[in-house]
């Protein structure tokens, strides 16, 4: 059933017969158009998320305005043909439009009582605010008069027309939106009013005429008056919006395929701006910031839906609707209960009340913070709605990084400049910037920034991604800034009405304080605070909800999860986050302390082996102490210690910093200099050339393991390319273990796989290894011939922008590296079935890479401590997906 609003008021229409008629008269071409009553939520790939859920809501009897959906297939065909409609699409749109007009008793463009429609995008994967929408389509100078007569409200008709001209000219004709906003500002100033809603019918009619003139001047042609021409242009514009820079940027950040395309939804307009008995709003079935089971959202009286999400006006909390619209609020509560019960998940719903009649315009799974995500699924399990395994699969593993966000130190003193809406939790410190381009540039350069705007728009997405947080003067909890920030885990404070932004001067003032671009500020998105200067932050505390969900994940996963940690403090943090051991402990970091570096340099500068051994004897106690601390922190879990890897010159000062008279040091620095040190004298090559270095490290490990009861040390040799290298290093390691009386400790000896030759010939190396660990950072560099620093600094961003690469290979495992890993697993286990295999690059915390590691049968992944929860959840999801 669908709800049609025609001359006889709201009525219900059955479409089954009509749909059959339409289908029978269509030519034998692809079905590019579906009525809302002709689809279901299972057709997301065809109808897009919005269209599929409109169809689903129609089927369960919710009051959804009538309409139809142009499919994603039509979009893909249109884009592939360079902007030409595929065969049959025009006829199908015409027939479905005729059916809509007949059911609603109104005609598009009718001069007496016109049918108006909205044209909205709908990707198969939610992309809030990234693509285009046009409202009130079908208006022209004649039909706007008919709308005024049929509605009995001249102001409403004039407002609808100026909105349509503004949207259509911007979205379809490409006229810059600022030109219209400037005209509105001039009109308000001339009439001495502050808000758009204070402009009367005459002012709005004048604005519509001015908008038409702006469009004519900017495009060099008349604004289209024919409703079908308007509709065709709008459909094409929505198709084209799939490839706008902001949409592509969002997809790249969220890992969404560029090949999906967007559907287009054409829906009968219902109006929240007909007067004080009309309203529009956005509401969530649960709080998307905390997960609390309470209606969360906002509404505006006498407004259209875009006013809420665009943040142009700061709306009212949804609870106030109970007093203003008691009947509408009851219908809203019923609809929200129905929707959450049907979808078994938190829903994000758009609604409109038109002269007392309640309509649902959209539902989708609500974007939520990680904190809310774990609470919602835990509550749904407690309520008996979903099972534990489904709860684990529901949480976005990559999103768990958000739970690692710091908070403001409770003991800190600071000056609160202003308060706003706590739109997205977490605290952020950075320098104020006032446009998205600056935020992107400074953020990419490694500078923490806070993006400050009147309100954000979808075009700001590239700046939001690079900023530490977002601060806006306008907009509410469901505005674009709030929704996008929550989805990305960025702290956000919205609706700070006391904020006075001077974009030209690049500064803002609030309550007597002026903050200029580059000044440090802090925001607390959990409490809605804007703070002067940089405040100290403290690490996050894990919640009971988080602990419950990750415990369920541990029950489901096969893959072990370890952490990369070089200090006892890192090791303790890793244990707190659930790490089952240390997969990579880098020993070189231990040589840089104030007491240690001079001794390390003394060892490097020694003239002979005797001198080196004397210096190493002084370094040994430092190493042993560090290893004891890490082994104690891991409480019997395995600790894989990598022997010295970087070239020795890294421990010496730069040549230009050395006193010219110090010839000995200058000579040694010059002798160690290499053209390509990454492929030079490093890793196990150091152990072969200077075995005394590795002997000292192995002694320190064995002595530490003997001192810490129940410890499980493992020794890993880096950069092995040849079996003969590992054989010699194993002989050295076993000899020292025996000399130190560590034979009964069961210390495992293994190697990193970070050179393609080692991966290709792993069957030759495996006999000498108890375990192999893929060093995927270096393996990616050696496989792709990419220097990470040079690639990320010079060309990688352009490769991603131009789709030469779809993903950053240093974040997600490249297919070539995956092929080498698969080859290694097969060949190593072919000669040594029980060999332990894992990875220890940062890829170990990337959900997509974790899924691959699970699929090829690795035993564990290892990542930074703060990514351990993500890896635990991703490992469980990978296992559950294959059950």
Task: Please report, for each region that a protein language model flagged, where it lies by residue.
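Conserved alpha/beta-domain cores
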Residues: 120-121, 542, 552-883
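Phosphate-interacting basic helix/loop segments used at nucleotide- and nucleic-acid interfaces
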Residues: 93-111, 218-228, 245, 325-348, ...
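N-terminal beta-alpha lobe that positions the nucleotide/phosphoryl donor
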Residues: 13-265, 410-454, 500-507, 511, ...
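Terminal amphipathic helices with adjacent charged low-complexity linkers/tails
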Residues: 70-78, 178-205, 299, 345-416, ...
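Conformationally flexible catalytic loops at phosphate/diphosphate-handling active centers
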Residues: 436-513
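ATP-dependent carboxylate/acyl-activation modules
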Residues: 29-32, 40-41, 162-166, 229, ...
């Amino acid at each position: 059933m669908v709800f049609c609003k025609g001359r006889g008021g709201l009525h219900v229409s059955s479409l089954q017969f009509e749909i059959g008629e339409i289908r029978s008269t269509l030519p034998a071409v692809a079905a590019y158009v579906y009525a809302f009553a002709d689809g279901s939520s299972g057709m997301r790939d065809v109808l897009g998320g919005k269209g599929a859920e409109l169809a689903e809501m129609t089927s369960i009897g919710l009051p959804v305005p009538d309409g139809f959906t142009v499919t994603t297939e039509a979009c893909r065909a249109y884009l592939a043909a360079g902007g030409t409609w595929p065969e049959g699409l025009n006829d199908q749109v015409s027939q479905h439009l005729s059916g809509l007009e007949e059911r609603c008793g109104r005609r598009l463009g009718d001069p007496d009582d016109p049918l108006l429609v909205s044209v909205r995008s709908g990707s198969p994967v939610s992309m809030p605010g990234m693509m285009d929408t046009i409202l009130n389509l079908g208006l022209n100078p004649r039909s706007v008069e008919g709308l005024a007569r049929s509605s009995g409200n001249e102001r409403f008709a004039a407002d609808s027309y100026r909105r349509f001209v503004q949207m259509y000219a911007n979205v379809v004709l490409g006229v810059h939106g600022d030109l219209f906003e400037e005209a509105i500002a001039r009109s308000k100033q001339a009439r001495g009013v502050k808000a758009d809603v204070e402009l009367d019918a005459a002012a709005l009619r004048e604005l519509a005429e001015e908008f038409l003139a702006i469009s004519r001047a900017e495009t060099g042609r008349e604004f289209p008056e024919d409703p079908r021409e308007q509709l065709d242009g709008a459909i094409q514009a929505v198709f084209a919006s799939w490839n706008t820079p902001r949409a592509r940027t969002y997809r790249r950040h969220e890992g969404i395929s560029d090949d999906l395309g967007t559907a287009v939804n054409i829906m009968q307009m219902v109006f929240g701006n007909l007067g004080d008995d009309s309203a529009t709003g956005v509401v969530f079935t649960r709080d998307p910031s905390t997960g609390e089971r309470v209606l969360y959202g906002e509404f505006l009286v006498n407004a259209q839906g875009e006013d809420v999400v665009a943040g142009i006006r700061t709306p009212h909390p949804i609870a106030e609707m109970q007093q203003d619209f008691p009947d509408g609020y009851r219908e809203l509560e019923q609809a929200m209960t129905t929707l959450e019960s049907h979808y078994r998940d938190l829903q994000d719903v758009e609604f409109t009340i038109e002269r007392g009649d309640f309509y649902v315009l959209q539902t989708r799974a609500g974007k939520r913070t990680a904190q809310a995500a774990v609470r919602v699924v835990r509550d749904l399990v407690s309520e008996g709605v979903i099972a534990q395994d489904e709860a684990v699969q529901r949480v976005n593993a990559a999103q768990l990084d958000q739970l690692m966000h710091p908070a403001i130190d409770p003991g800190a003193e600071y000056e609160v400049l202003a308060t706003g809406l706590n739109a997205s939790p977490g605290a952020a410190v950075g320098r104020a910037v006032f446009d998205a381009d600056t935020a992107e540039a400074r953020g990419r350069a490694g500078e923490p920034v806070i993006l400050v705007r009147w309100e954000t728009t979808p075009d700001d997405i590239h700046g939001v991604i690079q900023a530490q947080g977002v601060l806006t003067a306008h907009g509410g909890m469901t505005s674009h800034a709030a929704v996008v920030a929550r989805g990305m885990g960025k702290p956000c404070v919205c609706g700070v009405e006391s904020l006075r932004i001077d974009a030209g001067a690049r500064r803002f003032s609030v309550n007597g304080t002026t903050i200029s671009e580059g000044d440090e500020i802090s925001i607390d998105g959990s409490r809605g605070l804007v703070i002067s200067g940089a405040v100290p932050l403290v690490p996050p505390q894990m919640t009971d909800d988080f602990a419950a969900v990750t415990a369920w994940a541990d029950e489901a996963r096969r893959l072990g999860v370890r952490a990369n940690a070089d200090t006892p403090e890192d090791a303790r943090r890793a244990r707190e986050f659930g790490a089952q051991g240390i997969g990579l402990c880098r020993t070189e970091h231990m040589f840089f302390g104030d007491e240690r570096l001079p001794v390390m340099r003394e060892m490097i500068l020694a003239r002979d082996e005797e001198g080196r051994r004397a210096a190493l004897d002084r370094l040994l106690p430092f190493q042993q102490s560090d290893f004891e601390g890490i082994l104690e922190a891991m409480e019997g879990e395995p600790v894989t210690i990598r022997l010295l890897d970087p070239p020795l010159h890294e421990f010496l000062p730069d040549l230009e910093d050395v006193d010219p008279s110090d010839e000995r040091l200058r000579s040694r620095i010059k002798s160690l200099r290499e053209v390509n040190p990454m492929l030079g004298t490093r890793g196990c090559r150091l152990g072969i050339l200077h075995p005394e270095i590795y002997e000292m490290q192995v002694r320190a490990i064995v002595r530490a393991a003997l001192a810490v009861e129940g410890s499980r040390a493992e020794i890993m040799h880096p950069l092995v390319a040849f079996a003969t290298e590992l054989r010699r290093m194993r002989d050295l390691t076993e000899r020292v273990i025996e000399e130190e009386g560590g034979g009964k400790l069961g210390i495992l000896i293994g190697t990193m796989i970070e050179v393609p030759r080692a991966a290709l010939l792993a069957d030759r190396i495996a006999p000498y290894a108890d375990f192999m660990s893929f060093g995927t950072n270096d393996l990616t560099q050696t496989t792709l011939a990419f220097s990470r620093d040079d690639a990320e600094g010079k060309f990688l961003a352009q490769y991603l922008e131009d789709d030469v690469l779809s993903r950053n290979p240093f974040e997600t495992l490249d297919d070539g590296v995956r092929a080498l890993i698969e080859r290694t697993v097969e060949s190593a286990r072919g000669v040594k079935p029980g060999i332990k295999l894992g990875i220890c690059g940062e890829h170990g915390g990337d959900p997509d890479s974790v899924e691959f590691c699970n699929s090829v049968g690795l035993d564990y992944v290892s990542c930074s401590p703060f990514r351990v929860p993500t890896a635990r959840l991703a490992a469980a999801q990978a296992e559950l997906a294959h059950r």
